[in-house]
Each structure stands twice: as C-alpha cells, then as structure tokens.
A protein has these predicted regions:
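N-terminal Rossmann NAD(P)H-binding glycine-rich loop of SDR-like oxidoreductase domains
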Residues: 25-46
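Rossmann-fold cofactor-recognition segment
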Residues: 69-79
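NAD(P)H-binding glycine-rich loop region in Rossmannoid oxidoreductase-like domains
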Residues: 81-118
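NAD(P)-cofactor binding segment of oxidoreductase domains
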Residues: 110-138
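Catalytic helix-loop patch of NAD(P)-dependent Rossmann-fold dehydrogenases
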Residues: 117, 122-125, 145, 150-225, ...
Length: 383
C-alpha cells in the first residue's frame, strides 16, 4: 500500500499492473492536517495493507489494493470547483474521505458564510465531482446536527451537582465517585440515524446542510458518518486542552449539563476504513460506548493522566451549568454558540452493518469499548 502526504502532485497514480484486480485504487483524504485525517493515515500505516472488496454483497475474496493521498487545503480547496476538478483529473480517485471542515463552533456564529462554504458548499462540490467521475464519497458529520429537544432532567440534575459542590466546598478532582451520574434512567435514548435533526447552532446547521447537499447529489450512494466529541493525540481537542490547563491552572470550571460521548479519532478511523473496504453507503452514527458530561470527561482525564504520570498534581475541577458559563463568557465579551444538552449517538446500526474483512483493523474490538477505555488507550500513547 502506498501512503502519500505531500504538497506535490503525483505524476501518476496507479499504472503498475496489467490485471484489473491488482491495479491500486486511489483514496483521497481531504483536510490532511486534521486529527481524523492523521488518524486515518496512522491506522492505515499500522495495518500495512488495505484493500477494497470488489463485491461487497457477496462472499468473494477478490480484493483491490488501495493507494492513499492526504491533501491539505493548499492542495485541495473543497470550496473551489475548478481546483476539485483538476485534482480529480490528476488522481482519478475511487474514494474520497472528506475530513475537511469548519469546526470553530463559537466563531461560526459570527462567520456563517465561511462555515457554510466549508461545511455545506464544499461537500456539495465534492459530491458533484464524485458523481461525474464515478468516485465514492464518505463525508464526516457531527452530533451537533441534533439537540433541539429540551431536556429538563439534565438541567435539574446539573443544578443539584453544582449546588452540592458549592455547599460542600469540595473541588472534585481526586474521587471519581464525586462526579455526577449522567446515565439516569430518565435521560433520553441515544440518537439513531432516522431521528430528525434539529441543530441549535450555526455550526450544527452548516453540518446538516452539508449532509443534505451530499444526499441530494449522490442519493443512496452517499456515505455519511456522524460522530461526537472527537479527540486524539494530534490537534486541538478537549483532551489536549484539559491537559494543558491542568498543568497551568490551579482550578477549572467545566460544563456539567451537556451530555455526549467522547470518541477517539483512531477508533473512528478504523470504522471508516471498514466502511470504505466494504464499500458501504448510507448514514451511520459512530461514537464510543457510554455517555458523560464534559465535567465527567474532565474528571476522568485528570484521574487517568495522574495515574499515567502525565500530570504531577491534581487541580480542582468544579461543575458549572451552561447558563452560568455563558454568562461568565459574556462578561468577558465572548459570545458562545448554543450546544445540545444531549447528543449521544447510537452506533447500533453501524455495528450490525460491518463485517470485518481484515482482522488487523479491530484486534481488540476497541471500536466498541467504553469511552473510558478508549481514553486510556490514547493517553498511554502520550505517557
């Protein structure tokens, strides 16, 4: 398998074989510098070889090797139709995995034009070129397409946690049992693919619009993967932010009334490769198992980081409601986007769909582990 991450266009992609089954098929990965693109390349390199099933609906063992090219924005601007056409003409891809996205949730409230250009127009232009060329498109979306429902139980539970913390005067950083239980029976069920989206923010609306544009062009041939609370060893994400703050700040306030599920980028990458290898289409949800609040996530990050000597001393972690956090931000002149109070995704459809073609992709079934286990796997790589 050939993996290339470069600013230089290749002069040729796949002309080394005379038999159709052995001619490598090209996979383009957009947003090469994103944490997901890096995870896709890392997983592919660890596996050593990827291959398409030439007939995903049968038991045939015929496979086609893949060549991977990860393209940065300077190499492939997904909002530029002319640039896209030139890149497709040069590489002639069989698959495109779109990791390029505008992910600045708060900034999008004041930059809706750019958010929609990248998150909606870009996927649409990619889909149009895929339709013209016969390539397949896998587009990555977000749990933030959901969240329009009011979840009073979460707010009430969060208020109780905050009040208890204030009354006790305890900064919760040493005992994980002090973290609130975000899995009471009265919480909503995780979202499935057929649930109606109802985004709250400009970012969420732009991601939903991107999905709709892709499906409008490709119909049933589109592959869309929604994920949540993505983190990894590379890039800007909640885990790296918390670790940096825990090394420099005496205490932290973390939101307690937004419930979701953290997802390790490497696990998502493994799932994406399985979808590509099996040439699956449809809308799928993927996250780790379980659910938590940002506050619980922060407490668990610190607990594990201390155990792995990634942190030398604990810091105080105090729960705060979204309303209070927003007020504090406004007092500092910062406007925050609305976020869903509950955006847990059900991965059941995806899990039942996938049939492992390469055992190396999931030797320990980490894709279906609890979020705490996935977090531990990632943090151990940093220790």
């Amino acid at each position: 398998m050939k993996i290339v991450v470069t600013e230089a266009m290749p002069t040729q992609c796949a002309e080394a074989s005379t038999t159709e089954a052995s001619i490598p098929q090209v996979v383009l990965i957009t947003g090469a510098k994103s944490q997901l693109a890096q995870a896709l390349l890392r997983i592919a390199a660890n596996i050593g070889e990827l291959a398409l099933n030439s007939n995903a609906n049968t038991s045939t063992n015929t496979s086609i090797p893949l060549e991977l090219y990860a393209l940065s924005r300077s190499q492939l601007d997904i909002t530029d139709a002319v640039n896209i056409a030139a890149v497709f003409d040069q590489y002639r891809p069989s698959w495109v995995i779109n990791c390029a996205a505008y992910n600045a949730v708060d900034a999008a409230e004041h930059d809706a034009i750019e958010a929609n250009r990248v998150n909606a127009l870009g996927p649409e232009l990619l889909a149009q070129q895929c339709l013209l060329s016969g390539a397949r498109l896998l587009h990555v979306s977000s749990d933030y397409v959901f969240g329009g429902q009011a979840v009073c139980e979460i707010a009430h539970a969060a208020e109780r946690v905050v009040c208890d913390a204030r009354e006790s005067g305890v900064e919760q950083h040493q005992n994980p049992d002090l973290a609130p239980n975000s899995n009471p029976n009265h919480l909503p069920r995780p979202f499935v693919e057929l649930d109606a989206p109802e985004p709250l923010s400009t970012y969420g609306k732009s991601k939903l619009l991107g999905e709709l544009k892709v499906v409008a062009v490709l119909g049933d041939g589109a592959t869309i993967v929604r994920t949540s609370w993505l983190y990894g060893q590379n890039g800007h994400n909640f885990v790296n932010t918390m670790l940096n703050l825990m090394r420099t700040q005496p205490s932290l306030q973390v939101i307690v009334d937004q419930i979701g599920c953290p997802t390790w980028s490497d696990s998502l990458a493994k799932v994406i490769w399985q979808l590509v290898m099996q040439q699956r289409s449809g809308v799928f949800h993927y996250s780790a198992q379980g659910q938590c609040s940002w506050y619980e996530f922060a407490c668990e990050i610190q607990r594990q980081a201390l155990a792995l000597n990634l942190l030398s001393l604990p810091v105080g972690i105090l729960p705060i409601t979204s309303a209070d956090y927003t007020k504090q931000a406004l007092n500092r002149g910062i406007s925050l986007a609305k976020r869903p109070s509950y955006s847990v995704l059900s991965s059941g459809k995806l899990r039942s769909t996938l049939v492992t073609l390469n055992a190396l992709l999931m030797p320990e079934q980490i894709e279906w582990q609890d979020w705490r286990q996935q977090l531990n796997r990632m943090l151990r790589r940093l220790s």
